[in-house]
Each structure stands twice: as C-alpha cells, then as structure tokens.
Amino acid sequence: MTKEVRVRYAPSPTGFLHIGGARTALFNYLYAKHHNGKFIVRIEDTDIERNVEGGEASQLDNLKWLGIEYDESIDIGGPYAPYRQMERLDIYKEHAEKLLAQGAAYKCFCSSEKLEASREEQKARGVAAPTYDGTCRHLSAEEVAAKEAAGEPYTIRMRVPENVTYDFEDLVRGQVTFESKDIGDWVIVKANGIPTYNYAVVLDDHFMEISHVFRGEEHLSNTPKQMMIFDAFGWEYPRFGHMTLIINENRKKLSKRDESIIQFVTQYKDLGYLPEAMFNFFALLGWSPEGEEEIFSKEEFIKIFDEKRLSKSPSMFDKQKLTWMNNQYIKKLSLEEVVALSLPHLQKAGLLPDELSAVQHAWATDLIGLYHDQMSFGAEIVELSSLFFKDHIEYDEEAKAVLAGEQVPEVMAAFKAQLEELEEFTPDAVKAAIKAVQKATGHKGKNLFMPIRVVTTGETHGPELPNAICLIGKEKAIDRVEKFAQ
C-alpha cells in the first residue's frame, strides 16, 4: 500500500459513545494500526440543536478508556486542524460558492411548506421515496438575483447529474451501484448557512487526506451523494466499507430505545466492565479471526486484523458472550486489582463505609476474593455477596427442601455447640468444627454440609463454606443458627 492509510471516526456530539460508534471507531483504529497508518477523530457538530452537553467528552474519554488511541483530534491537534466542523465553516462556504459558480449547485428558494406539499403529492401518486421536484433548478440568474434582493431565504442544492451510475467496490459487501435518477437534487447548505452532513464530510475527508472510510451500513445510501461532491471538484474517492447492522437477540436492529441491552460505553464502565474485555468483544462484533480462539490482546488484534474478514451478515450483540468474556479477563486480575474494581460498588450500595479501617479493608478483600473467579463485572459483587449483609434470611423453595431433612435439627444443634466453643474463628477452625459435627452425629456429605450452608448463608450454592462462615462472623453465624432453631 503506497499511500499512507488515514482513517477517521467522525461522531456527532448529539449523544454519548454508543456501542455501534465504539465498534466503528475500533475497526477504523485496527485497520489504521495494522497498516501503520493514522486514526483521526473528527467532531461533526453542525446539528447544533441536537448537540448534548458532555457529548464530545463522552466520545473522547470513552475511546481512551477502551484503549482506542487516536493520532489527531480536537484535544491533541494535528496537521489538518481544526477537527471540529463548526470551526471549518469558511471552508464549506468557499467551496459551496465554487459549486455555484460552476453550475454544479444552485440556490433554492422553496419554502418548507411548499416542499412538504410536494412530498405529500408524490406520496399520493405512489412514489415510495419522494425527491425534490426541481422547481428552482432552472431559475435564471435574473430570477435568482431578484429573489435574493427581496430577502428571500434560500438553501443551496446539488444539481444531480442526469443518467449517471455511481458504482464502487465496497470493502465489506463488494460491488454496489446507485443511479442518479433515484436521488433528486439535495441540500448541501441549509438556509442558516450550516452545511449538511453529506457535503461537509466530503470536504473534510478530502482535505484531511482520508484514504479509507469504514462506517455503518446506514451510511451506504449517502455514498452516491458524496461521490457527486468528489466528482464536482475532480477529487479522488477514498475506499468505502460499510459494516453490517448490530442486531439484538431477537434478530432485530439494535435501537437506542431497546432497553434489553445496555447501549452506552460509559454504562459498562460504571458497572465495572474491563476496557480490555470490551475492546475484545467489540472487535468480534462483525469481524472474525481465523481459528476458534476468541481472546486476544490489543497488539494481537492489530497484527491479525484483515478487513476481508469483516462480516457481510448482521452481528448479534450477545450479552452472555460479553459477560463470559469479561469474566475471563477478571480471572486474570490480581486480587488487589479485583478489589479496586469491585469495592467501590459495595461502598456505593451503602454496604461498606467510604472510609475503611485496616480491619474492614482486610475483611472486604477476603470477601471479594471468594468471588474472584465467579464475578462477571465489578458491580455484580453487590448481588453475589448479599448473604454477608443480611439481617434476616428468607429461604427459597430449594433451601426449604434441604431444611426439611430429618437430620437437620441434630446437625444444626451440634454445629451451634461447636461454634460456641471456638476461640479462634478462622476457616481452618470452622472446617474442624464441621468435621467434629460429622463425628458426633454420623451425618456426612450433603446431609451434613447442605443444612449448614443453607442455615448460615441462606443459599444452596456459594463460595467455600468455611471461608464464608468465617467472614459472616461467629456472632452472626450463631445468631442465624438460633433463629433457624426457633
């Protein structure tokens, strides 16, 4: 590849970093780094009314958190600055005037009411996709001047060439073709002087020397409009690649209103998902490596990334796979790292104080250690460890079935007696106490362990029993046995 690879992720600050945007950014990043190229983040902020406070920061901060490092953007600058569209208005204005001068564009004075009436009339005739009817396309220079002199507001429209076929080799889906007759003259500059997306993006891509454009499938129909602008100026197209949709488990297109899936990167961060796991998961959301392996480091992904393996079929957002993958990464963490990940969630839930004594921190560390290999994300520790913070235990049907055994009263009475005699309350001491109960009662296996587990923890499954009872504490464990006996 002779020309330097330069790709871009160009979000609008109309919302926070979405999983779809994160995937787009990631594939662009991997492609650039695989080819020793540059990854640019450009902010497309011309939709002023819809821009939200914190939108820009969410995009940049969460990309950094994911480990998607960009080479040029609004915060670090670069040779093609500015990287914010509202700071590039002079460029768009200058080139719109060039398009007007060469007749490739024209001023349109049609009111929104007239345009709406035209759309409705076309729909009534059965036109599936109404287009502009061309009212102002043939205005003379004198007519245009008169309307301007009268102060009539206008937009600038692209004069769509007649009988032109726009075809290109899409890097994901192969040959794609559009016909100019299906497009209609479209607005490149709105009445307020702000450029539209399909116009501004071409100028930005050209002047920033973007070589490849990887983006979502929803942008496919924008491509012929953008090709018109490139053609009008005699500029070379970048290579285009349109990634398939992300779908939910019902195989429906992922919508931001779909509450069955957490959709924003910052939400995963807040729940205690790991950035390395999210990076790994997003990389496999519409791309597949050779072989069966699914866990890769960032460096490995950069080395093996091949755009030819981008999927042509919709990509399902598999929540269970993400949970499994995050657990694989949590297992690799040290105990200290797992504590740093999950302890704040216990504190936020009000289960532990914000300021911990050395004894409290040691207890919390042991508690979290019990669930190290089981934990799927940091916040899950609150649910996993709930048995340690309950004042009152309620037994479910499975637990009640265990406690219905004839041997249970004898086992629990013996266990209570053993607990009361313990001077040191350690896992080894509790283990010895359980063995003593076995010896005294003759009960063993599930008939011994299950009643003790259910009465002391309220659960039929859980972490290593002596360790759990030790963390519950002698006084609380005895209290739970006594309440059961009542």
UniProtKB/Swiss-Prot annotation:
It is an enzyme of class 6 (ligase). GO terms for molecular function: ATP binding; glutamate-tRNA ligase activity; tRNA binding; zinc ion binding. It catalyses: tRNA(Glu) + L-glutamate + ATP = L-glutamyl-tRNA(Glu) + AMP + diphosphate. ATP binds at K256. A motif ('HIGH' region) lies at residues 11-21. The keyword Glycoprotein does not apply. A motif ('KMSKS' region) lies at residues 253-257. HAMAP family: Glu_tRNA_synth_type1 (MF_00022). This is Glutamate--tRNA ligase.
